[in-house]
Amino acid sequence: MTNIRKTHPLAKIINNSLIDLPAPSNISAWWNFGSLLGICLILQILTGLFLAMHYTSDTTTAFSSVAHICRDVNYGWIIRYMHANGASMFFICLFLHVGRGLYYGSYMFPETWNIGIILLFAVMATAFMGYVLPWGQMSFWGATVITNLLSAIPYIGTNLVEWIWGGFSVDKATLTRFFAFHFILPFIISALVAVHLLFLHETGSNNPSGIPSNSDNIPFHPYYTIKDILGVLSLVSVLMVLVLFSPDLLGDPDNYTPANPLNTPPHIKPEWYFLFAYAILRSIPNKLGGVLALVLSILVLAVIPLLHTSKQRSMMFRPLSQCLFWLLVADLLTLTWIGGQPVEHPFIIIGQLASILYFMLLLVLMPIASIIENNLLKW
């Protein structure tokens, strides 16, 4: 008798994507992050669901309801901090996942890559709206500053901002709709993840060498299920150390002050995972230019497949490109640091140079390095 997992309509889908999936025999730990992102998403949806049971999306009670969750709800504090720090873990995995794709040329699967970019935007939007919900000072002013950026759009900008606000400032209507969007988006993300995997399983996974692995595939289970469990245990360990020992390490103290429209915090800054984009935004003295640079800092990923000039897919055997890749990593860390600093000398010029270098590396230097490497192969 044929195994039921191979014949049952539902079990067959799970079997083909998690059990009998042919996977390259040489994929490294860098390929763990896809499953880790799935775990993060499930964790965020579950903790978020329990938080939503006790949260009220009203300007007068939002801040108090979060305090109530932490003080009065059974294990509310751990659910709240797992949700807040789970977002940080989510973004760490996201950045590493995208970095892996850049390094090993996974962007040569265009559908998978483009849906990944849409997913990145969706997760960033969800995280931004979630940060507004506790209705602390940084929530309120972050929402005000970021939504205000849309007013830079010519002609329709001001109307668009007021439409998003549901009034003439960030208020009750804004908070309510942000809660609604923050609740629905993770389910949209889940659907996009399914499409992301659908396209990935059409081609099969890439591998570190960048060479087709059709002649040397192994079943996903038990090899990579066991390998993924190690990644999951590591992720959960780091998350729980963060949650149980220093839950506010990555947060902003200003968010423990209730939102006050009459008092602006000295330094308005987003969560750490948006600081690189915030630094790029601030490095341009023009409002519209800054907004465009902010969007392009992520959207630039979409043109990377078009700029692939190398004869090899992966950077594994391309030392020049490797140097530029790690320079890009250092540049992003610099931008993250600058994003959290006040707008004054010398941070302004460092931010501007780091922003120029970011776009130069991705759009100019890396394609040129690939051409040089192609020519070196002829020697």
Curated annotation (Swiss-Prot):
It is a multi-pass membrane protein. It is found in: Mitochondrion inner membrane. The keyword Transmembrane helix applies. Binds 2 heme b groups non-covalently. Heme b b562 binds at residues 83, 182. Pfam families: Cytochrom_B_C, Cytochrome_B. A ubiquinone binds at residue 201. PROSITE patterns: CYTB_CTER, CYTB_NTER. GO terms for cellular component: mitochondrial inner membrane; respiratory chain complex III. PANTHER family: CYTOCHROME B (PTHR19271:SF16). The cytochrome bc1 complex contains 11 subunits: 3 respiratory subunits (MT-CYB, CYC1 and UQCRFS1), 2 core proteins (UQCRC1 and UQCRC2) and 6 low-molecular weight proteins (UQCRH/QCR6, UQCRB/QCR7, UQCRQ/QCR8, UQCR10/QCR9, UQCR11/QCR10 and a cleavage product of UQCRFS1). This cytochrome bc1 complex then forms a dimer. Component of the ubiquinol-cytochrome c reductase complex (complex III or cytochrome b-c1 complex) that is part of the mitochondrial respiratory chain. The b-c1 complex mediates electron transfer from ubiquinol to cytochrome c. Contributes to the generation of a proton gradient across the mitochondrial membrane that is then used for ATP synthesis. Belongs to the cytochrome b family. This is Cytochrome b. It comes from Hydrictis maculicollis (Spotted necked otter).
